[in-house]
Design a protein with these regions (language model features):
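Electropositive, gly/pro-rich neighborhoods at or near active sites that engage anionic ligands
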Residues: 1-146, 277
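Structural signal for conserved beta-strand scaffold positions within catalytic alpha/beta enzyme cores
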Residues: 19, 72, 150-153, 207
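Surface-exposed alpha-helical segments enriched in charged/polar residues
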Residues: 59, 167-170, 194
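A structural signal for short coil/turn segments at secondary-structure junctions
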Residues: 65, 173-176, 200
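Residue-level detector of flexible, active-site-proximal loop/helix-junction positions
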Residues: 77, 156, 212
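Conserved nucleotide-cofactor-binding alpha/beta core module
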Residues: 132-176
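C-terminal functional extensions of proteins
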Residues: 184, 188-278
Length: 278
């Protein structure tokens, strides 16, 4: 089974599992001293606290847990740097970085079918589900039928709000031993999943990253090479009937156009600067 099928099976059978994506932003934050004051494509700043958290999270999740998958960035040189952090590289469970992201190459074959099945399985799970994401992903709560949603800022939340987010999650989980926590909250998600795994070793923790951006906000935040109609039709069988209710959701689309995917072009970034008064 590939990683999509593994996660689907684990969720169906309530087997503890996690998936965390380590991309170029996480790499630069963790390893590049010259980038210690830099930022990723979402203008999420690299900080020492985040750097230390990412390094610890990678070590812990790959060496101390049994069913934790690491979304592997496409550049093998970056993955070699991560491998250099640990003693036993054979314990690293590398997986497809785009496990939750629908690629243009997925359309028309079983890859798309399997990914929609994964989302369907999450949606149908009766585990208590909590999402951590920015407020424009409000529709994600309907997509996966989560019990709670915790909103964080679009970027730069980790240093000041990490402990607060952990406490909020603990409050919502209550006495449950096996929660499902879904993250779409940038680089800090990796550290969040690590700490939650320590607290709830029976839990299921899934790092969606930018995967839900397009279908939930109509904003192609990463340059997916397909249209909104394409992704909407792919998800249509599991979407609620009011998915396009403008009264309920109409305000999020314009805001998403200048707050998400701002690295894709100067026009979007200029709209963003105008919005914040700079």
């Amino acid at each position: 089974m590939d990683i999509v099928e593994v996660l689907t099976d684990n969720i169906k059978n309530k087997i503890p599992v996690s998936f965390s994506k380590y991309g170029d932003g996480e790499y630069f934050c963790a390893f590049s001293e010259e980038n210690v004051n830099g930022e990723n494509c979402d203008r999420d700043r690299y900080t020492n606290k985040l750097k230390n958290g990412l390094i610890h999270a990678f070590k812990y999740m790959t060496q101390e847990t049994e069913n934790s998958y690491i979304g592997m960035w496409w550049d093998p040189n970056k993955n070699e740097s991560w491998k250099g952090l640990v003693e036993n590289t054979e314990r690293i469970k590398w997986a497809n970085y785009h496990t939750f992201i629908v690629d243009v190459a997925d359309f028309g074959n079983d890859d798309l079918t399997n990914k929609i099945e994964l989302y369907t399985t999450i949606q149908e799970s009766n585990l208590k589900k909590i999402i951590v994401c920015n407020p424009l992903l409000v529709k994600l709560q309907d997509l996966v039928k989560s019990d709670y949603m915790i909103n964080i800022p679009f970027n730069n939340w980790f240093d000041e709000k990490f402990e607060e987010v952990i406490e909020s999650i603990k409050t919502y989980i209550g006495e449950e031993e096996q929660p499902m926590v879904i993250t779409s909250c940038g680089m800090g998600a990796k550290v969040l999943i690590c700490e939650l795994t320590k607290l709830y070793p029976k839990g299921i923790f899934l790092d969606f990253g930018s995967a839900p951006d397009f279908v939930c906000t109509k904003r192609d935040s990463r340059g997916r090479l397909y249209t909104y109609d394409d992704i909407y039709n792919a998800f249509l069988p599991i979407l609620p009937s009011d998915w396009h209710d403008d009264v309920k959701y109409g305000n999020i689309y314009k805001e998403a156009s200048y707050k998400m995917g701002i690295h894709l072009g100067d026009h979007a970034y200029n709209l963003y600067l105008h919005h914040i008064g700079k």
